[in-house]
Amino acid sequence: MYTMAVVYGVFFSCFGPSVKYIFFMEGVHMFKQYEMELAGRTLRVDIGRVCAQANGAALMHYGDTVVLSTATASKEPREGIDFFPLSVEYEEKMYAAGKIPGGFNKREGKASENAILTSRVIDRPMRPLFPKDYRNDVTLNNMVMSVDENCRPELLAMIGSAIATSISDIPFDGPCATTQIGMIDGEFIVNPSQAQWQDGDLQLTVASTKQKVIMIEAGANEIPEDKMIEAIYKAHDINQTIIAFIDKIVAEVGKEKHSYVSCAVPAEMFETMKQVVSPEEMEVAVFTDDKQTREKNIDAVTEKMKEAFADNEEWLAVLGEAVYQYQKKTVRKMILKDHKRPDGRAINQIRPLAAEVDIIPRVHGSAMFTRGQTPVSYTHLRAHETLA
């Protein structure tokens, strides 16, 4: 069936749009389209057109930019982990810009730096909206199929990921939406073109839910603080219109969220943990200025609890998360009540700073900057004038 689909795909692509319309008029494949006006252009979402076996899929159109966003989840939770296994992919294809990879190898290369950073930007607002105790593998994949320089595909992938996940049966406390704001000559530009994004004084990306802003990423020249705040509020307001649009799609084609095996820490487990290791003992374990000593203390606390819960497999499975939450509550109490951090610093006190220069011979310049227990080494090398 897959081979036949590929053959038909090549056939129809050769004959252009006229054959495509006949193909869909025959009723072979039905899908739904949704449209909204966004920053003076039409945002179109095709649901059910492709990827029928994914938990959720949306074919996004904005100008001539096209991005396929899918959300898939494993049927069973991954065993032996204490985190949510989410993977986000953003795939750039040369054909999307009408180009063919050059050189001897005509295949696509590895992910670019922009693709990796875009994947992270998609991940940041999405990850907190999944249940913390969800252990099924989830993959959000975004494939750029066509690029219009006036409509940035990164933005489309962010919105597409939210739509694909929201209409899927994967547990998700969304939707969320993303807007980009640029600024040229003091005027805001909503969802700017690639040239406006690069040449403007502001590069602001804001992700929101209905209730609040959940992610801000920005690069800018020097601009007034009130301008930045105004841009954030403007993006948040636009996000609300996108969220209303997503809600409409979910109401019509959204799937019922499936149930899952919760890996949350039982409330009674916390009470028992306090009997094994008292809050005062946990404070002593956490309160040290040496990170390695603190980690050894926490390991000792964990081992003590393992011995106490040796007969309870359910509690042992979530022990790592339970100890982390216990430690987190202890640190929070120390900061709010005693105004001290775990290493003894006051809340307004920075770590010790140190700087050295000329630490490496045979290079034109070198330096080492240390903050607390974290050193960073820098080197500078100037090429020979014959290589200029």
What are these regions (language model features)?
Residues 101-104, 123, 133-147, 215-217:
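Glycine- and acidic-rich phosphate- and metal-coordinating loops
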Residues 31, 55, 83, 109-130, ...:
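Alpha/propeptide regions of enzymes that mature by internal proteolysis
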Residues 379-388:
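Conserved small/polar residues in nucleotide/adenosyl-binding loops
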Residues 270-356, 360:
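Noncatalytic alpha-helical scaffolds and linker/capping helices
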Residues 152-165, 169, 358-377:
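Conserved phosphate/anionic-ligand binding catalytic regions in large, soluble enzymes, centered on
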Residues 132-138, 173-175, 242-260, 292, ...:
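Flexible, glycine/charged-enriched surface loops at secondary-structure junctions
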Residues 171-281:
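Mobile "lid/hinge" segments at catalytic clefts and subdomain interfaces of large enzymes
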